[in-house]
């Protein structure tokens, strides 16, 4: 839960350090986390010197084949995104953490990845943001 003394938050740009770069991923993840904090808390956005600060980086963005068939082709592929997040709470530093969050989604290997990439990224980002938010502000 959020301490009553915490009034402001900031989400620093989450940079992309993955080998495979998806151009909008950093911006989308940063903005989704900011939006979730604005919509689901009474906290106010503050560009710097906020009571709580999220920062981090995308460290992995990759596709790997899943469920290999008899003809040795994959029926499914898995897109995985891993992010390292640092959470700093200037009011209660016992809440501070550095954690890796990871989510994936599977898709049919017959689908054109380029055509579904944005949709898959949206699904994974929503799950990552939920986990980051819960870990920082719901304390589960």
For each of these PLM feature ranges, what is it?
Residues 8, 51-53, 98:
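A residue-level signal for beta-strand positions that form part of recognition/binding surfaces
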Residues 15-22, 111-119:
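Second-shell loop/turn segments in exported
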Residues 39-45, 53-96, 104-118, 126:
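Surface-exposed short loop/turn segments
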Residues 1-42, 47, 134-140:
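A structural "domain/chain start" motif
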Residues 117-140:
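Compositionally biased, intrinsically disordered linkers/stalks adjacent to structured regions
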């Amino acid at each position: 839960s959020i301490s009553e003394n915490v009034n402001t938050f900031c989400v620093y740009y989450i940079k992309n350090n993955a080998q495979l770069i998806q151009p909008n991923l950093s911006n989308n993840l940063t903005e989704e986390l900011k939006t979730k904090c604005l919509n689901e808390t009474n906290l106010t956005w503050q560009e710097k010197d906020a009571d709580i600060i999220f920062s981090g980086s995308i460290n992995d963005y990759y596709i790997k084949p899943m469920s290999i068939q008899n003809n040795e082709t994959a029926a499914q592929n898995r897109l995985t995104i891993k992010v390292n997040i640092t959470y700093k709470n200037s009011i209660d530093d016992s809440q501070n953490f550095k954690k890796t969050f990871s989510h994936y989604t599977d898709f049919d290997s017959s689908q054109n990845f380029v055509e579904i990439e944005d949709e898959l990224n949206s699904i994974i980002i929503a799950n990552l943001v939920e986990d980051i938010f819960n870990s920082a502000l719901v304390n589960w």
